[in-house]
UniProtKB/Swiss-Prot annotation:
The chain crosses the membrane at residues 222-242. Residues 1-25 form the signal peptide. Keywords: Angiogenesis, Endoplasmic reticulum, Glycoprotein, Membrane, Signal, Transmembrane, Transmembrane helix. Disulfide bonds: none annotated. Residues 26-221 are lumenal. One of its GO terms (biological process) is positive regulation of endothelial cell migration. Induction: By glucose in pancreatic islets. Residues 243-258 are cytoplasmic. The lineage of its organism: Eukaryota, Metazoa, Chordata, Craniata, Vertebrata. It comes from Rattus norvegicus. This is ER membrane protein complex subunit 10. It comes from the Eukaryota.
């Protein structure tokens, strides 16, 4: 009996250990897996850890056409609401093309997919984009600020880009100042819209009605309130005007007899 009880105890301990192993593996798998493999540009690995990636693309072409190419990735940590960026260096050909576009007052465009964690345009539900004059980006030495606007469902609804200090003054820029982007990124969560003041209006209306019910005198018209003052004044005017009218009539008759 003692041996059987010891065997049952060992079996229970073994089962508890086996049950505890998967939970620890699941808790550490997100951290270890992400650290070992890194966060891919498609965001699928990061999505399981609460972080999604958005492919950041840019285009700078002479003319109205756009040819978007990868600039980097925006990493959105949905758990703590932070946003960071990883970006690649511009090649010599890209730096020259950016200068050419700036010389003709062309545009520099950026875009991200509407749905985080997707690459293909059809799966991403389209893109949101923004632009600045290419000359202002060149003269800012590639210093810009990206602001990502998202909704409550986690979709991207807007993207804005601002360069510092901004403006096109024709300043000379060294080629080495156009190699790396100096970017700050900000996440703009959905704001709480002010609700209608229906409840306050109804409450104020009920208070006014209750006040009128307590003071019914306030609901009377002007004449109903002050009739006792108006009638004596009218009677006084009528009585004071009657003798004057009689006197004027008598005087007129005497004049006609002559």
């Amino acid at each position: 009996m003692v041996a059987a009880g010891a065997g049952v105890t060992q079996l229970l301990v073994l089962l508890l250990m086996v049950a505890a192993v998967p939970s620890r593996a699941r808790g550490s798998g997100c951290r270890v897996g992400a650290a070992a493999r890194g966060v891919g540009a498609d965001g699928h690995e990061a999505e399981g850890c609460g972080t999604v990636a958005l492919l950041l693309e840019h285009s700078f072409e002479i003319g109205d056409g756009a040819n978007f190419q990868k600039r980097g990735s925006l990493l959105w940590n949905q758990q703590d609401g932070t946003l960071s960026a990883t970006q690649r260096q511009l090649s010599e050909e890209e730096r020259g093309r950016l200068r050419d576009v700036a010389a003709v007052n062309g545009l520099y465009r950026v875009r991200v997919p509407r749905r985080p964690g997707t690459l293909d345009g059809s799966e991403a539900g389209g893109h949101v984009s923004s632009f600045v004059p290419a000359c202002s980006l060149v003269e800012s030495h590639l210093s810009d600020q990206l602001t990502l606007h998202v909704d409550v469902a986690g979709n991207v609804v807007g993207l804005s880009v601002v360069v510092y200090p901004g403006g096109c003054r024709g300043s000379e820029v060294e080629d080495e100042d156009l190699e790396l982007f100096n970017t700050s990124v900000h996440l703009r969560p959905p704001g709480t819209a002010p609700g209608p003041e229906t409840a306050a209006f109804i409450e104020r209306l009920e208070m006014e009605q209750a006040q009128k019910a307590k003071n019914p005198q306030e609901q009377k018209s002007f004449f109903a309130k002050y009739w006792m003052y108006i009638i004596p004044v009218v009677l006084f005017l009528m009585m004071s005007g009657a003798p004057d009218a009689g006197g004027q009539g008598g005087g007129g008759g005497g004049g006609s007899s002559r």
